[in-house]
């Protein structure tokens, strides 16, 4: 399954999500950001590639709303996007962030 992890800045959360699956034989993962200055921005090609899209936070950062508006012409976009509810409180690849990601992904049947 192709997994896309999206946060705002593409610095910590989404990159950590991608890193979790770097050695996976079951899943392929990529990451991107929605922010103006991020190095890898989410685009139509990534969205179409993904079977599931995990945004980190809707409440404070509006990531799901951004994705739904920007990519509204992509069929079944609503079904692909899942909100993990992880705030930008963790450094990249920190044990706490890894544990939080694993716990949230498990709810969607994704095991690392």
Protein language model regions, located:
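Conserved active-site segments centered on acidic
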Residues: 1-52, 102-112
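Short, solvent-exposed loop/turn segments at secondary-structure junctions
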Residues: 9-12, 59-60, 87-89
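Short amphipathic alpha-helical segments
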Residues: 17-19, 65-69
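Residues at the C-termini of beta-strands that transition into short coil/loop
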Residues: 33, 57, 84-87
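Generic alpha-helical secondary structure signal
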Residues: 41-45, 65, 95-99
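Short, structured active-site "lid" loops
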Residues: 45-66
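Phosphate-binding/catalytic loops
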Residues: 68-112
